[in-house]
Amino acid sequence: MNFKYIVAVSFLIASAYARSVQNDEQSLSQRDVLEEESLREIRGIGGKILSGLKTALKGAAKELASTYLHRKRTAEEHEVMKRLEAVMRDLDSLDYPEEASERETRGFNQDEIANLFTKKEKRILGPVLGLVSNALGGLIKKIG
């Protein structure tokens, strides 16, 4: 009879442990879902900010291009305009990253693809912002 009690108590302990493990797994999966939703929201906000920044840069570059389009330019200004045109092409390529890098992303999972695009945006936007600020600074000095 003692053996039956030992088996019954062991079974109760094992089932309680299994339930606690299952509850832990559920709470972890719920935390993962919440973290993933938070990351999506952050990426969405970051995407909107980048989109606004790209639009502003495009507008500034187009305005500069139209300002200096009809007057005689020096060689230095011509070089600045070429750089601005290259910046515009880079910004346009950011609008359609799937087409631009379709071959690179085959075989990657979704996280790797998201990280790849984020790295590409940082790699392109950093020099682009520097180039635009240098070009604007140089043009403002010449005007003033």
UniProtKB/Swiss-Prot annotation:
It comes from the Eukaryota. Keywords: Amidation, Amphibian defense peptide, Antibiotic, Antimicrobial, Cleavage on pair of basic residues, Cytolysis, Fungicide, Hemolysis, Secreted, Signal. It holds the Pfam family Bombinin. It is found in: Secreted. One of its GO terms (cellular component) is extracellular region. The keyword Signal applies. GO terms for biological process: defense response to bacterium; defense response to fungus; killing of cells of another organism. Its main location: secreted. Residues 19-43, 74-123 form a propeptide. The keyword Aminoacyl-tRNA synthetase does not apply. Residues 1-18 form the signal peptide. The modification Isoleucine amide is found at I143. Expressed by the skin glands. Maximin-3 shows antibacterial activity against both Gram-positive and Gram-negative bacteria. It also shows antimicrobial activity against the fungus C.albicans, but not against A.flavus nor P.uticale. It has little hemolytic activity. It possess a significant cytotoxicity against tumor cell lines. It possess a significant anti-HIV activity. It shows high spermicidal activity. Belongs to the bombinin family. This is Maximins 3/H9 type 2.
